[in-house]
Amino acid sequence: MNFNATFIGQMVAFAIFIYLTYRYVWPPIVAAMAERSKRIADGLQAADRAEKDLELAQKKVVEQLTSAKKEAAAIIDQANKRAIEIVEEAKLKAQQEAERVKASAQAEIELATSRAKEELRSKVVVLALAGAEKILESSIDQNAHNELVNKLAAEL
Protein backbone atom coordinates (compact mmCIF):
# COMPACT_ATOMS: atom_id res chain seq x y z
CA MET A 1 0.00 0.00 0.00
CA ASN A 2 1.35 3.38 -0.98
CA PHE A 3 1.17 6.34 1.32
CA ASN A 4 1.14 9.48 -0.63
CA ALA A 5 -0.13 13.01 -0.22
CA THR A 6 -3.63 12.09 -1.30
CA PHE A 7 -3.95 9.59 1.44
CA ILE A 8 -2.72 12.08 4.03
CA GLY A 9 -5.07 14.70 2.62
CA GLN A 10 -7.95 12.27 2.89
CA MET A 11 -6.99 11.48 6.48
CA VAL A 12 -6.83 15.17 7.35
CA ALA A 13 -10.15 15.77 5.60
CA PHE A 14 -11.66 12.80 7.46
CA ALA A 15 -10.29 14.08 10.78
CA ILE A 16 -11.76 17.53 10.08
CA PHE A 17 -15.03 15.84 9.13
CA ILE A 18 -15.03 13.86 12.41
CA TYR A 19 -14.18 16.98 14.43
CA LEU A 20 -16.89 19.07 12.77
CA THR A 21 -19.40 16.24 13.12
CA TYR A 22 -18.45 15.75 16.78
CA ARG A 23 -18.51 19.50 17.40
CA TYR A 24 -21.62 20.65 15.47
CA VAL A 25 -23.70 17.68 14.32
CA TRP A 26 -23.39 15.26 17.23
CA PRO A 27 -24.61 17.55 20.12
CA PRO A 28 -28.02 18.27 18.54
CA ILE A 29 -28.47 14.56 17.79
CA VAL A 30 -27.52 13.62 21.36
CA ALA A 31 -29.77 16.40 22.71
CA ALA A 32 -32.68 15.18 20.55
CA MET A 33 -32.11 11.62 21.70
CA ALA A 34 -31.87 12.72 25.35
CA GLU A 35 -35.04 14.80 24.98
CA ARG A 36 -36.84 11.90 23.34
CA SER A 37 -35.61 9.54 26.06
CA LYS A 38 -36.79 12.01 28.70
CA ARG A 39 -40.21 12.32 27.01
CA ILE A 40 -40.53 8.55 26.88
CA ALA A 41 -39.56 8.26 30.56
CA ASP A 42 -41.98 11.05 31.48
CA GLY A 43 -44.70 9.32 29.46
CA LEU A 44 -44.05 6.04 31.25
CA GLN A 45 -44.14 7.80 34.63
CA ALA A 46 -47.34 9.57 33.65
CA ALA A 47 -48.83 6.24 32.58
CA ASP A 48 -47.82 4.71 35.93
CA ARG A 49 -49.30 7.69 37.80
CA ALA A 50 -52.46 7.50 35.72
CA GLU A 51 -52.72 3.77 36.43
CA LYS A 52 -52.30 4.38 40.16
CA ASP A 53 -54.78 7.25 40.04
CA LEU A 54 -57.23 4.99 38.21
CA GLU A 55 -56.83 2.30 40.87
CA LEU A 56 -57.36 4.90 43.62
CA ALA A 57 -60.40 6.28 41.82
CA GLN A 58 -61.81 2.78 41.44
CA LYS A 59 -61.25 2.12 45.15
CA LYS A 60 -62.95 5.41 46.01
CA VAL A 61 -65.86 4.55 43.72
CA VAL A 62 -66.22 1.15 45.38
CA GLU A 63 -66.08 2.78 48.83
CA GLN A 64 -68.63 5.40 47.82
CA LEU A 65 -70.93 2.75 46.33
CA THR A 66 -70.65 0.69 49.50
CA SER A 67 -71.32 3.75 51.60
CA ALA A 68 -74.26 4.76 49.42
CA LYS A 69 -75.71 1.25 49.58
CA LYS A 70 -75.41 1.23 53.37
CA GLU A 71 -76.98 4.67 53.58
CA ALA A 72 -79.78 3.63 51.22
CA ALA A 73 -80.41 0.49 53.28
CA ALA A 74 -80.54 2.60 56.45
CA ILE A 75 -82.97 5.04 54.83
CA ILE A 76 -85.14 2.15 53.60
CA ASP A 77 -85.14 0.58 57.07
CA GLN A 78 -86.04 3.92 58.61
CA ALA A 79 -88.83 4.42 56.07
CA ASN A 80 -90.16 0.92 56.74
CA LYS A 81 -90.15 1.57 60.48
CA ARG A 82 -91.93 4.87 59.96
CA ALA A 83 -94.49 3.18 57.71
CA ILE A 84 -95.13 0.58 60.41
CA GLU A 85 -95.50 3.35 62.98
CA ILE A 86 -97.97 5.18 60.74
CA VAL A 87 -99.98 1.98 60.22
CA GLU A 88 -100.03 1.32 63.96
CA GLU A 89 -101.10 4.90 64.66
CA ALA A 90 -103.86 4.59 62.06
CA LYS A 91 -105.01 1.30 63.61
CA LEU A 92 -105.07 2.88 67.06
CA LYS A 93 -107.00 5.90 65.79
CA ALA A 94 -109.43 3.62 63.96
CA GLN A 95 -109.97 1.57 67.10
CA GLN A 96 -110.53 4.71 69.16
CA GLU A 97 -112.96 6.04 66.56
CA ALA A 98 -114.77 2.69 66.47
CA GLU A 99 -115.05 2.71 70.26
CA ARG A 100 -116.32 6.28 70.21
CA VAL A 101 -118.89 5.46 67.53
CA LYS A 102 -119.89 2.33 69.44
CA ALA A 103 -120.29 4.31 72.68
CA SER A 104 -122.30 6.97 70.84
CA ALA A 105 -124.51 4.31 69.26
CA GLN A 106 -124.94 2.62 72.64
CA ALA A 107 -125.97 5.94 74.19
CA GLU A 108 -128.43 6.53 71.37
CA ILE A 109 -129.84 3.02 71.81
CA GLU A 110 -130.25 3.56 75.54
CA LEU A 111 -131.90 6.94 74.93
CA ALA A 112 -134.24 5.44 72.33
CA THR A 113 -135.04 2.55 74.69
CA SER A 114 -135.76 4.99 77.49
CA ARG A 115 -138.00 7.07 75.23
CA ALA A 116 -139.80 3.95 74.01
CA LYS A 117 -140.38 2.83 77.60
CA GLU A 118 -141.74 6.24 78.55
CA GLU A 119 -143.98 6.28 75.50
CA LEU A 120 -145.12 2.75 76.24
CA ARG A 121 -145.86 3.67 79.86
CA SER A 122 -147.97 6.61 78.82
CA LYS A 123 -149.86 4.47 76.29
CA VAL A 124 -150.36 1.69 78.85
CA VAL A 125 -151.71 4.22 81.34
CA VAL A 126 -154.11 5.63 78.76
CA LEU A 127 -155.21 2.14 77.75
CA ALA A 128 -155.58 1.08 81.39
CA LEU A 129 -157.66 4.16 82.11
CA ALA A 130 -159.78 3.56 79.06
CA GLY A 131 -160.25 -0.04 80.06
CA ALA A 132 -161.03 0.88 83.65
CA GLU A 133 -163.42 3.55 82.42
CA LYS A 134 -165.23 1.08 80.27
CA ILE A 135 -165.34 -1.43 83.08
CA LEU A 136 -166.67 1.08 85.51
CA GLU A 137 -168.64 2.77 82.77
CA SER A 138 -168.19 5.93 84.47
CA SER A 139 -165.81 8.78 83.91
CA ILE A 140 -163.12 9.62 86.41
CA ASP A 141 -162.59 13.29 87.13
CA GLN A 142 -159.46 15.04 85.81
CA ASN A 143 -157.54 15.41 89.12
CA ALA A 144 -158.06 11.77 90.02
CA HIS A 145 -157.08 10.87 86.47
CA ASN A 146 -153.77 12.82 86.70
CA GLU A 147 -152.98 11.26 90.07
CA LEU A 148 -153.67 7.78 88.76
CA VAL A 149 -151.52 8.40 85.64
CA ASN A 150 -148.58 9.67 87.71
CA LYS A 151 -148.90 6.75 90.12
CA LEU A 152 -148.97 4.17 87.30
CA ALA A 153 -146.07 5.88 85.52
CA ALA A 154 -144.01 5.74 88.71
CA GLU A 155 -144.79 2.05 89.17
CA LEU A 156 -143.85 1.14 85.62
Swiss-Prot record:
One of its GO terms (molecular function) is proton-transporting ATPase activity, rotational mechanism. Keywords: ATP synthesis, Cell inner membrane, Cell membrane, CF(0), Hydrogen ion transport, Ion transport, Membrane, Transmembrane, Transmembrane helix, Transport. Signal peptide: none annotated. The chain crosses the membrane at residues 7-26. It is found in: Cell inner membrane. CDD domains: ATP-synt_Fo_b. GO terms for cellular component: plasma membrane; proton-transporting ATP synthase complex. The keyword Membrane applies. Pfam families: ATP-synt_B. The keyword DNA repair does not apply. It is a single-pass membrane protein. HAMAP family: ATP_synth_b_bprime. F-type ATPases have 2 components, F(1) - the catalytic core - and F(0) - the membrane proton channel. F(1) has five subunits: alpha(3), beta(3), gamma(1), delta(1), epsilon(1). F(0) has three main subunits: a(1), b(2) and c(10-14). The alpha and beta chains form an alternating ring which encloses part of the gamma chain. F(1) is attached to F(0) by a central stalk formed by the gamma and epsilon chains, while a peripheral stalk is formed by the delta and b chains. Belongs to the ATPase B chain family. F(1)F(0) ATP synthase produces ATP from ADP in the presence of a proton or sodium gradient. F-type ATPases consist of two structural domains, F(1) containing the extramembraneous catalytic core and F(0) containing the membrane proton channel, linked together by a central stalk and a peripheral stalk. During catalysis, ATP synthesis in the catalytic domain of F(1) is coupled via a rotary mechanism of the central stalk subunits to proton translocation. NCBIfam families: ATP_synt_b, PRK05759.1-2. This is ATP synthase subunit b. It comes from Cellvibrio japonicus (strain Ueda107).
